[in-house]
């Protein structure tokens, strides 16, 4: 069956998709209804259970000198060693067994889904709902990715949306490519990040036992799932060298997943078009979407953060949406929230940069 037909079948037959629209207001010259042009943060029909990931245009940085940058030397040393190990791993790729390649790719996609379908679209934005087996899989996959536990990841991401491009944004892209890519992890957080982050409502995360269980046992969990397991499996089961298991299956794979995620914060805030909202920094970046399994449609995502697809086009260069739709077909995901075409077109007409291409 063609992919687009299968997608329609999943969307319509197995579970409901909540369509989000803006209420009609004035009448166009041709007699059609015009969608209300209120700012996103004032719309009434977003998720009733979470609004702390909606951009707040009223927040401005405080005037005055910037605080002194404090380096976290432990992180600097560990990140440097990781990337040196990953570079060495690249040279070892030709010597790896075929199953080690497959293992690395498998681990890459599963851990990436732990971030994209898990920490991001499910727990940060509540853009769909997941039953226990899927939540359990995603919490394990997220631990495999080792990008902070879900609670901390979601807190920082909600702050990133609500206070975007300010000092309260943990990876503020106005501080440059390197800072928004990895530098924000190598220095102490700006005081504004701590101050405004403490005001966010995280009660939904605190009420979820799986999220808090992961947070409680995160250190032993990440050691096992991100480092020990991916190293031991190829070494034990198909006789891969211990060196290749460490530097290719573990260090290189982990570094690639990290940088794919970081490019959403850096490249997708600096390079690309802004067809949905030219007034915000995030861009549409196809290359980022390829590496981050669907997270590169960033101008759309910041315009409509509650859309479970993080894109207008669902499966187009968006493996994460494909995965969520497959889970919906199995009855494990439901209440997927999708913005209506009318609301999208109204936003494009109001704030787009003129580079929108339908389809």
UniProtKB/Swiss-Prot annotation:
Motif (Histidine box-1): 120-125
Mode of membrane association: Multi-pass membrane protein
rRNA processing among keywords: no
Cofactor binding summary note: Expected to bind 2 Fe(2+) ions per subunit, instead of the Zn(2+) ions seen in the 3D-structure.
Tissues where this protein is expressed: Detected in fetal liver, lung and brain. Highly expressed in adult adipose tissue, and at lower levels in adult brain and lung.
InterPro entries in alphabetical order: Acyl-CoA_DS, FADS-1_CS
Domain of life according to the entry: Eukaryota
Entries under CDD domains matching the protein: Delta9-FADS-like
Catalyzed reaction equations: octadecanoyl-CoA + 2 Fe(II)-[cytochrome b5] + O2 + 2 H(+) = (9Z)-octadecenoyl-CoA + 2 Fe(III)-[cytochrome b5] + 2 H2O; hexadecanoyl-CoA + 2 Fe(II)-[cytochrome b5] + O2 + 2 H(+) = (9Z)-hexadecenoyl-CoA + 2 Fe(III)-[cytochrome b5] + 2 H2O
Lumenal topology ranges: 94-97, 238-241
Binding site for substrate: 75, 148, 155-156, 188-189, 262
Keyword Endoplasmic reticulum: yes
Motif extent (Histidine box-3): 298-302
Main location: endoplasmic reticulum
Binding, Fe cation 1: 120, 125, 157, 161, 301
GO molecular function terms attached to this record: iron ion binding; oxidoreductase activity; palmitoyl-CoA 9-desaturase activity; stearoyl-CoA 9-desaturase activity
Keyword terms of this UniProt record: Endoplasmic reticulum, Fatty acid biosynthesis, Fatty acid metabolism, Iron, Lipid biosynthesis, Lipid metabolism, Membrane, Metal-binding, Oxidoreductase, Phosphoprotein, Transmembrane, Transmembrane helix
Domain notes: The histidine box domains are involved in binding the catalytic metal ions.
Protein purpose: Stearoyl-CoA desaturase that utilizes O(2) and electrons from reduced cytochrome b5 to introduce the first double bond into saturated fatty acyl-CoA substrates. Catalyzes the insertion of a cis double bond at the delta-9 position into fatty acyl-CoA substrates including palmitoyl-CoA and stearoyl-CoA. Gives rise to a mixture of 16:1 and 18:1 unsaturated fatty acids. Plays an important role in lipid biosynthesis. Plays an important role in regulating the expression of genes that are involved in lipogenesis and in regulating mitochondrial fatty acid oxidation.
Subunit structure: May self-associate and form homodimers.
Protein name as annotated: Stearoyl-CoA desaturase
Species: Homo sapiens (Human)
């Amino acid at each position: 069956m063609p992919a687009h037909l299968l997608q329609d079948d999943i969307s319509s037959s197995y579970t409901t998709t909540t369509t989000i629209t803006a209420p009609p207001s004035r009448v166009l010259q041709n007699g059609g209804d015009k969608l209300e042009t209120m700012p996103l943060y004032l719309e009434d029909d977003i998720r009733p259970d979470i609004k702390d990931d909606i951009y707040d245009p009223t927040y401005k940085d405080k005037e005055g000198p910037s605080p002194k940058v404090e380096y976290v030397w432990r992180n600097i040393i560990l990140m440097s060693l990781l990337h040196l190990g990953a570079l060495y791993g690249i040279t070892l790729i030709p010597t790896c067994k075929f199953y080690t390649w497959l293992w690395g790719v498998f681990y890459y996609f599963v851990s990436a889904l732990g971030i994209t379908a898990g920490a991001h679209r499910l727990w940060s934005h509540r853009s769909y709902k997941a039953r226990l087996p899927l939540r359990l899989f995603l919490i394990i996959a997220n631990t495999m990715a080792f990008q902070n536990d879900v609670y901390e990841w979601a807190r920082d991401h909600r702050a990133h949306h609500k206070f975007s491009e300010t000092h309260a944004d943990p990876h503020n892209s106005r501080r440059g490519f390197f800072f928004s890519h990895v530098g924000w992890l190598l220095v102490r957080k700006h005081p504004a990040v701590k101050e405004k982050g403490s005001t966010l409502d995280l009660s939904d995360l605190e009420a979820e036992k799986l999220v808090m269980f992961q947070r409680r046992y995160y250190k032993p969990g990440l050691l096992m799932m991100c480092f020990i397991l991916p190293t031991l499996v190829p070494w034990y089961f198909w006789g891969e060298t211990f060196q290749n298991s460490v530097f290719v299956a573990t260090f290189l794979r982990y570094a690639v997943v990290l940088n794919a995620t970081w490019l959403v914060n850096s490249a997708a805030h600096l390079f690309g078009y802004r067809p949905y909202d030219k007034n915000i920094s995030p861009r549409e970046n196809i290359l980022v979407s390829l590496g981050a399994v669907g997270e590169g449609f960033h101008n759309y995502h910041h315009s409509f953060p509650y859309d479970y697809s993080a894109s207008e086009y669902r499966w187009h260069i968006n493996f994460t949406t494909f995965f969520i739709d497959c889970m919906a077909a199995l009855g494990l995901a439901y209440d997927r929230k999708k913005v209506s075409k009318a609301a999208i077109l109204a936003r494009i007409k109001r704030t787009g940069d003129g580079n929108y291409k339908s389809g």
